[in-house]
UniProtKB/Swiss-Prot annotation:
Keywords linked to the UniProt accession: Secreted
Taxonomy of the source species: Eukaryota, Metazoa, Ecdysozoa, Arthropoda, Chelicerata
Keyword Secreted: yes
Main location class: secreted
The protein, known as: Cryptide Pep-15
Highest taxon above the source species: Eukaryota
Keyword Secreted included in the entry's annotation: yes
Tissue: Expressed by the venom gland.
C-alpha cells in the first residue's frame, strides 16, 4: 500500500 503522495506517485510509477 503506497502512500498517497504527489512526490511518491512519481517514484512509484
Amino acid at each position: 500500500r503506497p502512500p498517497h503522495n504527489p512526490g511518491f506517485l512519481t517514484v512509484y510509477n
